[in-house]
């Protein structure tokens, strides 16, 4: 992926909103690995190289396998304001997921305590009193149910559910962990 292939939804002097494709990390610590932060920074630089290296702040992240909308701040003021809005729920985090199985309710709220294992890059549901546990809350609504085919299982007609998801919190692997705990893991996960 190069900067010509970034799908920009909105850009002004302060922010840039774009689509992050499946498989591209939001940020990467590995040199030579393309990531959205580097691609967007290169896009900004190429559009005005006379301004030098641009300022860019990632406002939120999406997991590498996830496709979705990313918001970047192009100025320190915008970064501060967008982070304030995110913390005060001035704008939300909305997702659409394809899950295996069918939830028992058409809509609901999941509240669990999650603990992160940084070395294994995993998270799991745990008891509320567990040291390091953090509250995770999401709301879901069924969009459609049926056998949906997707790239990782093109001949599989297992029951699946398309869900709209709104996060109140943004925990590590929150959606995949909470949906799996509910009995409806992300399809192909």
What is the predicted role of each segment?
Residues 1-189:
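RNA pseudouridine synthases
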């Amino acid at each position: 992926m190069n900067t010509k292939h970034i799908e920009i939804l909105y850009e002004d002097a302060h922010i840039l909103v774009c689509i992050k494709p499946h498989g591209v990390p939001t940020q990467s610590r590995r040199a030579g690995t393309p990531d959205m932060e580097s691609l967007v920074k290169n896009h900004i630089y190429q559009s005005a190289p006379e301004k030098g290296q641009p300022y860019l702040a990632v406002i939120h992240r999406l997991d590498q396998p996830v496709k979705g909308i990313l918001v970047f701040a192009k100025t320190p003021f915008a970064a501060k304001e967008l982070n304030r809005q995110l913390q005060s729920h001035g704008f939300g985090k909305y997702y659409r997921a394809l899950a295996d199985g069918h939830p028992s309710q058409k809509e609901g709220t999941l509240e669990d305590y999650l603990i992160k294992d940084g070395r294994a890059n995993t998270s799991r549901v745990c008891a509320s009193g567990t040291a390091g546990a953090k509250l995770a809350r999401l709301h879901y609504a069924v969009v459609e149910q049926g056998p949906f085919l997707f790239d990782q299982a093109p001949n599989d007609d297992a029951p699946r559910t398309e869900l709209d998801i709104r996060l109140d919190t943004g925990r590590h692997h929150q959606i995949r962990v909470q949906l799996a705990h509910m009995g409806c893991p992300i399809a192909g996960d």
